[in-house]
Amino acid sequence: MSAENNNEKNTQELELWERMSTTEGAERAEVLDELSHIAYRRDAFNECLQLVDTSIDIYFKLGMDSHIKELIHLYEGKALSLRNLKRPAESADTFEEIAKFYQLDDDAVGYLRAKRAAACDWYDAREWQKSLDGHIAAQVAIDPDATPMSMGIDLLNIGTAQIKLDLHTEAVVAFLSARKLFKEAKNPEYVNWADQYLAITYAALENGPEAKFHAKHHFNYSKVAEDMSLEGFARYRLGIAHLLCQEYEDAERELVSALEQLTLDENKDWEEILGANQALAKALTALGKEEEANIRLERIATIAETIFGDADAA
């Protein structure tokens, strides 16, 4: 940004602060809103929150019913600031409030957008049941703009929350329905997402053949897309499926390859790496290679304790 532009922005902000001393009511709330935009653009999210909250208070004193659109706008700024501050539970709560305002304003599209945003943030806050409830609410609501993609994404989100709640049978139903919708939308990337989650869910249900079917599709996509990072995850899922099917040599081959690829990633997914090592140890043990399996488990013990908090793992 040039010095001239920066000076213009500083001048604009100073003028707005000066107006604060001469305004009241709705005009004052509007000035606070403009100042919050300036704070947001320079990543001053705490300052933005303070300005937004003050503006919100004014509108409530003036009468909520006559200022719903202004309140929606302000609450959206508040939610986005909270997201940037990594406070997902608070941003989720704020999006829930936004959804209520949209209902009062008879805006079905806005309501759905806010409910979906709240559900996603509840997921980030590890509030799995609230996330599931939110995504189900979005799914069952009448959506005038519904498409196979939007319906599929709702189901995908429902399934991921169900996995966290150990509702694996229910998650399978959601993912299969999502997969069908993504195929209808001719979107191979999202069909792949459904296959990935189906491989995970069927494995949790110890259904080896179905886990292998979807893991193979997940793997095929990673090869066609030439995505090495994705291929590592796909090989891990395929290895787990082979293990469940008692195909131990195939499991060993896929899990060894998976680890070669997963460990190359700069931002390592330690939970996946540990899971692949533990699965590989099971395959090795089944193949009579207990010493090799034990060595592998000993090597990951401290990392496992660090990630999972297992005091016995160190």
Language-model-detected regions and their locations in the chain:
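Tetratricopeptide repeat
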Residues: C48, T54-S55, S91, F95-A99, ...
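Amphipathic alpha-helical segments of tetratricopeptide repeats
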Residues: W17-E18, I56-G63, E96-D107, I136-A146, ...
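C-terminal non-catalytic interaction modules
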Residues: M1-E15, S257-A314
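Residue register within tetratricopeptide repeats
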Residues: N10-T11, N46, A89, Q129, ...
